[in-house]
Regions:
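Non-heme Fe(II) oxygenase metal-center motifs and adjacent flexible, charged/small-residue loops
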Residues: 1-217
């Protein structure tokens, strides 16, 4: 996982040849990951998110205060845009500029009226999973999916590409098109128990959190 001093360089992997789907390894440092997790915890502190789902190991959607399953933001002035979306965009743009990649990296642009929603799903170790699916979000949006805590065994597949299976580590960000036209299938097949530095949140050793930021273009 990324460390708190940003000594591990970010790296971009193009997962699919036929659709926009990019994995950014080590996108967020441990300090940034902890900041995100602390904000999630603060915003859900008055809600009972500790109870296990009735059908273990079904993943649990974190419910925020006010009985909301998603956070909604307008503009860039929030920790999720600044640390996840902007960090990922900066890395993708740098990848194109420095390495002159022939693949067309797609990154969002933001204005003060940019709309963004954030949802968080918590997975149990080791059998937490999410069936393969297509998001079917047809509102001209892009997804930035951050993994926190224990790593996930993750699957992505495009309509014309081979299935890709990879270990989705804490601090990695997956950027992809969630539309029906893109038809990117993705899912979680299992969760790995990983080791973490002593200054990590205790929950990182018990769970995997999928933090999905959906940004309208």
């Amino acid at each position: 996982m990324s460390d708190s001093n940003n000594t591990t360089s970010a790296a971009v992997e193009v997962l699919l040849d036929d659709r926009p789907c990019y994995l950014i390894r080590n996108c967020l440092s441990l300090t940034q990951q902890t900041t995100i997790y602390q904000d999630i915890s603060h915003r859900s502190k008055d809600t009972d998110n500790q109870s296990k789902p009735c059908m273990h190991p079904t993943p649990k959607t974190i419910i925020f205060d006010g009985n909301q399953s998603t956070l909604k933001f307008s503009g860039r002035n929030n920790v999720y845009y600044e640390l996840i979306v902007q960090t990922a965009n900066d890395i993708l743009k740098k990848e194109v500029a420095l390495l002159q990649k022939s693949h067309s990296f797609f990154t969002t642009t933001s204005t003060d009226s940019t709309k963004m929603s954030v949802g968080v799903i918590r997975y149990q170790v080791p059998n937490g999973n999410f069936p393969n699916h297509i998001d079917h979000c047809n509102d001209n949006s892009f997804v930035y999916l951050l993994s926190l805590g224990c790593s996930a065994n993750f699957v992505v597949k495009g309509p014309e590409s081979e299935k890709q299976v990879f270990r989705f580590n804490s601090g990695d960000v997956l950027v992809f098109d969630p539309s029906s036209d893109a038809a990117i299938v993705h899912g979680v097949t299992g969760i790995n128990r990983d080791d973490f530095p002593s200054n990590s949140p205790n929950e990182f050793q018990q769970f995997r959190f999928g933090v999905q930021c959906r940004v309208k273009l």
